């Protein structure tokens, strides 16, 4: 078991089945709950990135021609390695992201469960099909795109990347993986699990680095990019490929998600699901509700009072503190300051603070939950604040609640807490989002379903169960084993 004070020295870039010590610019990650150095390594150089792309191309033909059953066997061997390293991986996720250990353990379980679900999804959505016609066999098969880049996210450093990598490999692609620069240590352990699975050299390659490394990687000869992150970064990726439409992009870009509270009987249940919607993972889930839309009534007042009290009593701290915390820090001290500045701007726009978000410890990402009433604010920004911070909006009638919920250019998740089934039907019919939940947190999602949004939340390439769709392309064939002249020939042709 690693010590909190131990600095992990990087193994290097993972290229062609080997760890290669590089000499690029220094890259470091810190424990956001303490501000202490955790991992030290190097950014990938341009030469290392080009070499990784070369070996991925070289490995592609053999890997694509490997049977699906054999490719699936490697992914199951990967799961065995993750199982062996379950405790170490969970602890490392907590050290590098600040998540409570209970949440990191849940993430590791998601990594493990993803493989069988991805195999099932591939067989259901991209399995070969054949239909006999009068003239030939009509065949549908699927081929891999080629070399795909996976750009990892820090909030689920093992699970979200894995959600792209596993279906990409199952489909026969080779992978160039650039983790988030905030979570390189977790990425190294995940890649070591792939290495120990016996995966052939060149099939997966890992390149650590900052945004500049990512830009260099995207300029290579690649056929796909799978990204999870902010709208601003996703937009830059989209613009970078405006002259390369042949490269498939799967972009998941977050949201300014609404949660509507109806005139409910169980206020405590509404508070509980709202906390899970807004504050879990320190508000760093793309599905977190940012806007809480409550009735301007006694019910709304009571809900807000209890919600604020529960947030004030919430345990916040390092993952190894006792009693165990509900949330840890945001990913860095820099991000914490950015979120506090966003709160200040909302106050200047007319927002009324109910519970201030505050920095709890200098040089860390530890912030307390914040709540602000934006009902009377002028022109509130339609932006995602990736923090434990909720904006309150009040409504007088349910139609107004739906109107407020839809006042966003995003469209990832939306939720309704209500005892009224008719209201849910109205909500479902009128809300524009890729995930719509009823009496469940907005953060509740299942890997057995698609995961993706509309508007500025994505580009219509949902992941999770539908990831198989963007990892392979369909090939339609009309086939017959013997070359013959048809009995019924077209008019105007004479064959001697």
Curated annotation (Swiss-Prot):
SUPFAM superfamilies per record: ALDH-like
Coiled-coil region(s): none
Family to which this protein belongs: Belongs to the aldehyde dehydrogenase family. AstD subfamily.
Functional note: Catalyzes the NAD-dependent reduction of succinylglutamate semialdehyde into succinylglutamate.
GO CC annotations, alphabetized: cytoplasmic side of plasma membrane
GO function term, MF aspect, one: succinylglutamate-semialdehyde dehydrogenase activity
Residues involved in NAD(+) binding: 229-234
EC number(s) on file: 1.2.1.71
Keyword NAD belongs to the record: yes
Chemical reaction(s) catalysed: N-succinyl-L-glutamate 5-semialdehyde + NAD(+) + H2O = N-succinyl-L-glutamate + NADH + 2 H(+)
Source organism of this protein record: Legionella pneumophila subsp. pneumophila (strain Philadelphia 1 / ATCC 33152 / DSM 7513)
InterPro entries membership: Ald_DH/histidinol_DH, Ald_DH_C, Ald_DH_CS_GLU, Ald_DH_N, Aldehyde_DH_dom, Proline_metab_enzyme, SuccinylGlu_semiald_DH_AstD
GO biological process: arginine catabolic process to glutamate; arginine catabolic process to succinate; proline catabolic process to glutamate
Key words of the record: Arginine metabolism, NAD, Oxidoreductase
Pathway terms, separated by semicolons: Amino-acid degradation; L-arginine degradation via AST pathway; L-glutamate and succinate from L-arginine: step 4/5
Superkingdom classification of source: Bacteria
Enzyme class: oxidoreductase
Active site residues of this protein: 252, 286
Name this protein carries in UniProt: N-succinylglutamate 5-semialdehyde dehydrogenase
């Amino acid at each position: 078991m690693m010590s909190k004070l131990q600095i992990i020295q990087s193994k290097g870039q993972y290229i062609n089945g080997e760890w290669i010590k590089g000499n690029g610019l220094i890259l470091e990650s810190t424990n956001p709950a303490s501000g202490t150095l955790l991992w030290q390594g190097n950014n990938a150089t341009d030469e290392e990135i080009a070499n990784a792309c070369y070996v991925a191309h070289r490995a592609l033909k053999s890997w694509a021609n490997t049977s699906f059953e054999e490719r699936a066997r490697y992914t199951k061997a990967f799961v065995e390695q993750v199982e062996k390293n379950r405790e170490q991986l969970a602890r490392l996720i907590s050290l590098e992201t600040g998540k409570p250990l209970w949440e990191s353990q849940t993430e590791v379980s998601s990594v493990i469960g993803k493989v069988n679900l991805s195999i099932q999804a591939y067989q259901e959505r991209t399995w070969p099909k054949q239909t006999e016609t009068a003239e030939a066999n009509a065949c549908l098969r699927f081929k891999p795109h080629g070399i795909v880049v996976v750009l990892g996210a820090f909030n689920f450093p093992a699970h979200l990347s894995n959600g792209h990598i596993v279906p990409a490999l199952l489909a026969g692609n080779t992978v160039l993986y650039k983790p988030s620069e905030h979570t390189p240590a977790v990425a190294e352990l995940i890649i070591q699990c792939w290495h120990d699975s016996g995966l052939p050299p060149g099939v997966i390659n890992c390149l650590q680095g900052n945004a500049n490394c990512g830009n260099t990687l995207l300029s290579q000869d690649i056929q796909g990019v799978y990204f999870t992150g902010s709208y601003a970064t996703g937009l830059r990726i989209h613009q970078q490929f405006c002259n390369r439409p042949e490269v498939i992009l799967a972009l998941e870009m977050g949201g300014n998600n609404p949660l509507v509270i109806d005139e409910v009987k169980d206020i405590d249940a509404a508070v509980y699901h709202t906390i899970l919607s807004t504050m879990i993972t320190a508000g760093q889930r793309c599905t977190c509700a940012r806007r809480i839309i409550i009735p301007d009534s006694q019910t709304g007042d009571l809900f807000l009072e209890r919600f604020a009290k529960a947030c004030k009593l919430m345990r916040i701290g390092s993952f190894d503190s006792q009693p165990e915390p509900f949330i840890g820090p945001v990913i860095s001290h820099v991000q914490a300051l950015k979120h506090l500045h966003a709160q200040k701007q909302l106050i200047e726009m007319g927002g009324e603070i109910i519970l201030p978000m505050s920095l709890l410890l200098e040089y860390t990402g530890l912030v307390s939950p914040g709540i602000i009433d934006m009902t009377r604010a002028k022109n509130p920004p339609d932006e995602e604040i990736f923090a434990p911070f909720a904006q309150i909006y009040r409504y007088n009638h349910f139609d107004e609640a739906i109107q407020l919920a839809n006042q966003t250019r995003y469209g990832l998740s939306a939720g309704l807490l209500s005892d009224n089934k008719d209201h849910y039907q109205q909500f479902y019919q009128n809300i524009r989002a890729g995930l719509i939940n009823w009496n469940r947190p907005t953060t509740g999602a299942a890997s057995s379903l698609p995961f993706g949004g509309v508007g500025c939340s994505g580009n219509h390439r949902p992941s999770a169960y539908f990831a198989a769709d963007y990892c392979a392309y369909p090939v339609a064939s009309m086939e017959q084993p013997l070359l013959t002249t048809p009995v019924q020939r077209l008019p105007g042709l004479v064959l001697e």
